Amino acid sequence: MLQGTLDRIVLQLLSAEPTNGYDLTQRICAISRDTLNVNAGSLYPALYRLERRGLIRARWVQTENGRRAKVYSVTAAGRAHLTDQRETWARFASAMAAVLRVT
């Protein structure tokens, strides 16, 4: 995965719905049809990095089975950052598509 891509994916998915790390990895895998398999060794450093930057926040919740889980959600700063990054990502994706069409 390209540098920064995981951060972008995490922000995008958390903007749709707050969730815990395990469910986030499952959603990434399902949405990408098993193309993107993110392990805990990559995901949790990304979550901590985004939290330190103030783009997401974490809170502990009690699950249905009585366990505690850390749920992550996007902050206002994270939503603004995501909006800015959408244009950048669209340009990047367009450029990559053009390069990949070269024969």
Segments predicted by a language model, with ranges:
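Amphipathic alpha-helical dimerization/coiled-coil segments
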Residues: 15, 79-103
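Beta-hairpin "wing" of winged helix-turn-helix
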Residues: 51-68, 73
